[in-house]
Amino acid sequence: ATEITAEYRVPFLAHATMEPLNATAHITAGGLEIWSGNQLPSFTRRACADAAGLPENRVTVHTTLMGGGFGRRGELDFSVLATRVAMARPGTPVMTTWSREEDMRRDFYRPAAIARMRGAVKDGGAVLFDAAVAGPSTARQALERWMGFAPPGPDKVHVEGLWNQPYAIPNARARGHVAPDLKVPVGFWRSVGNSYNGFFHESFVDEMAHAAGADPLQFRLALAQDAWRPAARVLEAVREMSGWPDKPEGTGRGVAMCFSFGTPVACVLEVAE
């Protein structure tokens, strides 16, 4: 067998939703009303009630349409800020809107992460896949903010997309290591662990296909057929849609697949000179 190793790193990323964070709050003798495009109405109500010193039954949250959330609007800070400003102007509706700079600077970021991969190929196929990823824990930080504590035990979010891909590799292992507090606030970012683990996993599958001297799509298809037929059909579909392996002169193509939240997704990317 031929052994391959690789290391990958990804940075912290802001959500950068199209609509910067904003909320409107109105405090009267009857209580608090807040208009907020949020992803956690019950937690928003509780946090705003605490900020205003009111019982929850005197707080009404109007969950509006939002110009992108991606996990960022699951946080409570922007709704609480509007509440606190409204407390200084009772009887007057107050709207707070963050600048783009404030929105980027005060995010709860997608974690930075590092992955170290080891694999082996033999007779044109993969026979070993060993992966380790390290980075801050999104789930632990977010749950501590929302509920005041994080349940003990392994963090499945940290390794999703790394251990559960539909490839039949006979010797496979995935490990997650939660980094100590890096003093950078992290939070849920669309697709969560899959956003970096999918990249790590598929980048390394390409390395294994190259080491095996195999076509990268056919290499994946052979592994998927023995693991889960629906995933294999997805690869067959993108093969047909893209006309793989035929391509115009002066172009390059890549393929990737990721099983995320119950669905296998594959894509073919074409780059031209």
Please provide the spans of the model-predicted regions.
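Structural alpha/beta core scaffold segments of enzyme domains
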Residues: A1-E273
